[in-house]
């Protein structure tokens, strides 16, 4: 079984302009300096390159890799500038888009800064029956704040699987909220809640293993390890070896598709991962899909 546990389908109307401009700054600077020498194929108003991916693209990726599923993570940016589409419009767009193939498992996303966030979660769960919810603390909340109590209680009561971002964030988003350690009080208070810390903790990787050692309901995914390619590819194996040797049944395969796909396809990423020596077939099968399938309740 092969499941990509970390996939995005972005809609330009939901993305904060400032974050996109921050992302594009080095590209635009290169164009301004060297554009007279090279045809770079874009103008100064080029869009964020990874939104508006045709639905056929992830379907083709699943087909080419004999993939059993993609977990599609929604992020609620409406309150921080992605306000040309309401949250409910965004969720309707996403779930409708994913309905064309039953291998998609779309998750809802609700910013806890909304005053009616718990009620919105309940409403969206009744409407769409998602398997889980995506958290993005960089929009401006600490996961362990007291004001989050009603939010987490609703998530727990509804039995939602949680995927939370960890690591770097682009302005106007703030990575100070994205430390894995901040999830410890939540994981301890709700031991039945399953929580996936994305990106192996990202730039706060050193906080991940102590958290997982303390809380056996905390998992992680390997998405965005492609960021080490091609110059420091050895880090992919190192990070995976470190995690799998400690928590073989609590790390899941993920890519952050489509963020790296133009440079390093899912197939290339898998080939790189396959350079490691697997401790057993069970550990390999758990990593690629069985653990995520159990978390989704489909195995």
Language-model region placement:
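Active-site environment of divalent metal-dependent phosphoester hydrolases
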Residues: 10-13, 77-80, 112-116, 168-172, ...
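Acidic-histidine catalytic/liganding microenvironments
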Residues: 100-101, 127, 190, 215, ...
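Mid-to-C-terminal alpha-helical segments outside catalytic/metal-binding sites
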Residues: 1-5, 12-61, 122, 247-252, ...
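Active-site gating/metal-coordination segments in enzymes
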Residues: 68-178, 227
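Hydrophobic faces of well-ordered beta-strands that scaffold small-molecule active sites
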Residues: 3-7, 70-72, 105-108, 131-135, ...
